[in-house]
Amino acid sequence: MNAVTESAATTEMPAPFVFTDAAADKVKQLIDEEGNPDLKLRVFVQGGGCSGFQYGFTFDEEVNEDDTVLNKNGVVLLVDAMSYQYLVGAEIDYKDDLNGAQFVIKNPNATTTCGCGSSFSV
């Protein structure tokens, strides 16, 4: 397990991805609604979609040995080793605007995305 704490302190390892306050706050709200403080947000990449890969989000109680763990505002974000390589440098955000409310991943590794934005290729 690789643990990373997102912080302004210069002595800590920089976070491999950006987990925004808006995303962490929304996850915290969803966990509170579920009533299970052991839940953690798992972000993953899997094959599929029209561009080859797609993002997935799920709640998980378990931390796997190969997970990278990021803590933000009391919320734990998990990324497995396979997904890590596709998500390094990405920003995981939550947007609530005229287009609706959703988690959004801005990924600098994606070379193309589909029209709906739910799949990508590298």
From Swiss-Prot:
Residues the record lists as binding iron-sulfur cluster: C50, C114, C116
GO MF assignments: 2 iron, 2 sulfur cluster binding; 4 iron, 4 sulfur cluster binding; iron ion binding
Keywords: Iron, Iron-sulfur, Metal-binding
Cofactor remark: Binds 1 iron-sulfur cluster per subunit.
GO biological process terms held by the UniProt record: iron-sulfur cluster assembly
Reported cofactor(s): iron-sulfur cluster
Alphabetical list of PROSITE patterns matching this protein: HESB
Cystine connections: none
Pfam family, one: Fe-S_biosyn
Presence of keyword ATP-binding: no
SUPFAM superfamilies per record: HesB-like domain (SSF89360)
Subunit structure comment from the entry: Homodimer.
Function: Required for insertion of 4Fe-4S clusters.
Family as reported in the entry's similarity comment: Belongs to the HesB/IscA family.
The protein, known as: Putative iron-sulfur cluster insertion protein ErpA
Organism phylogeny: Bacteria, Pseudomonadati, Pseudomonadota, Betaproteobacteria, Burkholderiales
